[in-house]
Amino acid sequence: MAILTNTGRSELVKAILEQPIFMAWGRADGTWTSPESEAIDATALQDVIGFRKATQVSYCEPDDNGAIEVSSGKFTLTNEQTRHLFLQFRFDFSDALGETIREIGVFLNTQLKAGLPEGQVYFANDEVTNAGQMLLLENYRPLVRDEGVRESFDFVVTF
């Protein structure tokens, strides 16, 4: 039986690092009071609000004393190629203000409309021509966007 080696896995991370990476958040089904299970064959969010370009994308490695803490453990950033991918998305206070977030997805190769301002990092759904390929999906308990909160999402994806 053939296996995907750690070197092969780190090459997958390297290929992903070279792609435009965005996180989208959405309303999902407005009747949710608790999150539905994520569908492994999902390709899109149910009701997209907007997209945010990744704030930070890097290799990382497991580290019991690491500063990056996610549900799967602690990690440290590294310049060395690894099979662990760190993704961070920091939204501004005004992004999707007043919206209720129930779903998020991380997308590769997101395509934007032409002519948008240089340096823009948050995009309403109508400013995106193609969401791209969904890498991650997570459903949440309803999260109401408040003007006094700056949302930040950290992920470590291990291949």
Outline where the language-model segments fall.
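Small cysteine-rich, disulfide-bonded extracellular modules of the LU/uPAR three-finger superfamily
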Residues: 1-101, 110-159
